[in-house]
From Swiss-Prot:
Monomer. Pathway: Metabolic intermediate biosynthesis; chorismate biosynthesis; chorismate from D-erythrose 4-phosphate and phosphoenolpyruvate: step 6/7. Belongs to the EPSP synthase family. 3-phosphoshikimate binds at K21, S22, R26, S168, Q170, D317, K344. Phosphoenolpyruvate binds at K21, G94, R122, Q170, R348, R391. This is 3-phosphoshikimate 1-carboxyvinyltransferase. Catalyzes the transfer of the enolpyruvyl moiety of phosphoenolpyruvate (PEP) to the 5-hydroxyl of shikimate-3-phosphate (S3P) to produce enolpyruvyl shikimate-3-phosphate and inorganic phosphate.
Length: 432
């Protein structure tokens, strides 16, 4: 599907976003591990989260979607999964594959998990290595690196003390989910703090888990987790597209309600504020052990910054839209230490560089990031490629709002992977 984006003068709107993708995945998995009913409100029904739902049902979970954003999980406890009769397909979802590898490694049965063309080229050895040390057996392509992956699980999961080579919430979460089955204490130590949704949710459901700085300590379950009512806050990664839209269009004010403001996710807000963004968090509260608030965003004059090191894991998903903000910032913006972007749904460093050059932006590609010279006009009258990457597609749509002429974006349907309602909300903010 090809779409055309035409420029807009300003944005003045109030919006509410669908549920957070990371949290929706985890609520399905942890609810299935628990005993009793878990009712999930504001669930994100996207291609990625439905991959998780379908895989869980394939191994014996009982999950019913009773409306677009409401799901009921009839939890049977951690020891009641069954061997699947077919290959499990995570499609495009790396979160599904990596977190489910943690669960499957601790089951006393055989399973095979695969994905689409893109996911089968994403690195999995970083998850296989620690789970193998815990007792799971894995067989994968290219010397244990790529899916399809055969898993011979075991009920004799061993506790582990593990230092992750990179900060990765998915690697950490896979270990923590397997550790629920271990007898004793498992520690995960990261070089920098990554998203902590899994830790917060496990604690909310009754696990014995503690965090200190970049170390997480969890004890294996002596009784099942308990099903809970759960509200999924709005997705801050999804909000970031509209935040940047309001910042870079003139005379704009945008209110985004009930957004998750977990400190391990607000890196994008910190970076944008460093750039001079007028963003305020109001009406703060805590729901299900997750901080939530409303975001008030106003047009701002931005300046270039350098982003590197420990900040990168906290904004890794938002770098494509941050690049759009950088095109309108005064001076140079540098992104470095972000080589992980090359192993996402597409090589995002290359994709961002190629598409921004089409739009007339002065950008220099580097091995681990890029430099953007800002304060530039975005040139329209061209067709951009999404590379079937949802975050690239949505970032280009935001760029189109301030282009001097309309732009077209190919394969825009890929936004359904994470944000099926994007086009509807995008049109809403333009029309008010």
């Amino acid at each position: 599907m090809k779409i055309e984006v035409t420029p807009t003068e300003n944005i003045n709107a109030e919006i509410t976003l669908p549920g957070d993708k990371s949290i929706s995945h985890r609520a399905l998995i942890i609810g299935s591990l628990a005993e009793g009913e878990t009712k999930i409100h504001n669930f994100l029904s996207s291609e990625d989260t439905l991959s998780t739902l379908n895989i869980l049902n394939s191994i014996g979970a009982s999950i019913k979607q009773i409306s677009e954003d409401e799901v009921i999980v009839e939890g049977k406890g951690k020891d009641n999964f069954i061997e699947p009769s077919n290959v499990l397909n995570a499609k495009n979802s790396g979160t599904t594959m990596r977190l489910m590898m943690g669960v499957l490694s601790a089951q006393n049965f055989y399973s095979v998990i695969t994905g689409d063309d893109s996911l089968r080229e994403r690195p999995m050895k970083r998850v296989i290595d620690p789970l193998s040390k815990m007792g799971g057996r894995f067989f994968a392509r290219k010397n244990g690196e790529f899916a399809p992956i055969t898993i011979l699980g075991t009920k004799d999961i061993s506790p582990l003390v593990y230092k992750t080579p990179v900060a990765s919430a998915q690697v950490k979460s896979a270990i923590l989910l397997a550790a629920l089955y271990a007898k004793g204490e498992t520690q995960v130590i990261e070089p920098a703090k990554s998203r902590d949704h899994t830790e917060r949710m496990l604690k909310y459901f009754g696990a014995d888990i503690a965090q200190k700085d970049t170390t997480v300590v969890i004890r294996g379950l002596t009784k099942n987790l308990e099903g809970r009512e759960f509200f999924v806050p709005g997705d801050l990664s999804s909000a970031s597209f509209f935040i940047v839209a309001a910042l870079i269009t003139k005379n704009s004010t945008l209110l985004i309600k009930n957004v998750g403001i977990n400190p391990t996710r607000t890196g994008i807000l910190s970076v944008l504020k460093m750039m001079g963004a007028d963003i305020k968090i109001i009406n703060e509260k805590t729901l299900n052990n997750e901080p939530v608030g409303d975001l008030l965003v106003k047009s701002s004059s931005l300046k270039g910054v350098e982003i590197k090191g420990e900040m990168i894991p906290l904004i890794i998903d938002e770098i494509p839209i941050l690049a759009i903000a950088a095109t309108q910032a005064k001076g140079k913006t540098t992104i470095k230490d972000a080589k992980e972007l090359r192993y996402k749904e597409t090589d995002r460093i290359r994709a961002i560089t190629r598409e921004l050059k089409k739009l007339g932006i002065d950008i220099l590609e580097k091995e681990d990031g890029f430099d953007i010279i800002g304060n530039q006009k975005i040139r329209g009258n061209c067709t951009c490629e999404s590379y079937n990457d949802h975050r690239i597609a949505m970032s280009l749509a935001i760029a189109g709002l301030i282009a001097d002429n309309p732009i077209e974006i190919d394969n825009f349907e890929c936004v359904n992977i994470s944000f099926p309602e994007f086009t509807e909300i995008f049109e809403k903010i333009r029309s008010i």
